[in-house]
Curated annotation (Swiss-Prot):
Organism superkingdom: Eukaryota
Name recorded for this polypeptide: Altered inheritance of mitochondria protein 11
PANTHER family: ALTERED INHERITANCE OF MITOCHONDRIA PROTEIN 11
Protein's organism: Eremothecium gossypii (strain ATCC 10895 / CBS 109.51 / FGSC 9923 / NRRL Y-1056) (Yeast)
CC terms in the record's Gene Ontology section: membrane
Family: Belongs to the AIM11 family.
């Protein structure tokens, strides 16, 4: 046996004996009471899955609109590019309708801006699990320090009946266990 292996064997032996001493202690450690939130329960309901699917589809719809607007704007820019032929002057401006070009530029810019902002807003709402305007206002009020009685409505705002019943049963069981 080489001398280089001996320190590793010694360290391993010390770890094993320390673990066995720790498990042999006679006083068990008190465990903190387990608290299950209503949100953790509602993750498994079909209503929650449908809600998240709707948020995802809204975001992907905004993304598709943005990509379509970008493609149209790119294609419109390429079509307006002036490439002179063999015997045409390159310093001469081609005939074009300035009103039509302004209208197209406004439409492309509006489409890109609307799509970008829609992606930003819907993506943020998807991450924050917000589906409706009243739910958004409740979340903002909770962030700004509204009283807890108002924020209690926020937790139960998007739960189905079965989830609320299960949460009530678990809370009552935990209360009985504490008493």
């Amino acid at each position: 046996m080489s001398l280089a292996i001996i320190p590793f064997i010694t360290i391993g032996w010390l770890r094993c004996t320390r673990k066995s001493r720790d498990t042999m202690s006679s006083s068990p450690e008190p465990q903190a009471p387990m608290h299950v939130t209503q949100r953790q329960i509602s993750v498994f309901s079909d209503e929650f899955r449908q809600r998240r699917r709707q948020q995802m589809l809204r975001f992907f719809g905004a993304t598709a609109f943005t990509l379509l607007s970008a493609r149209l704007a790119f294609r419109g820019t390429i079509n307006r590019k002036y490439v002179p032929n063999m015997f045409q002057l390159n310093h001469r401006v081609p005939l074009a309708s300035s009103q039509g070009e302004a209208l197209h530029a406004f439409a492309y810019g509006s489409g890109l801006a609307t799509g970008g902002f829609a992606m930003l807003i819907l993506g943020t709402c998807w991450l924050a699990d917000v589906s409706t305007v009243p739910e958004f206002s409740l979340r903002i009020k909770a962030l700004l320090g509204e009283s807890d009685t108002q924020s209690g409505r926020l937790e139960s705002a998007h739960q189905d009946k079965e989830t609320r019943e299960l949460a009530a049963m678990l809370d009552s069981l935990l209360q009985e266990k504490k008493d």
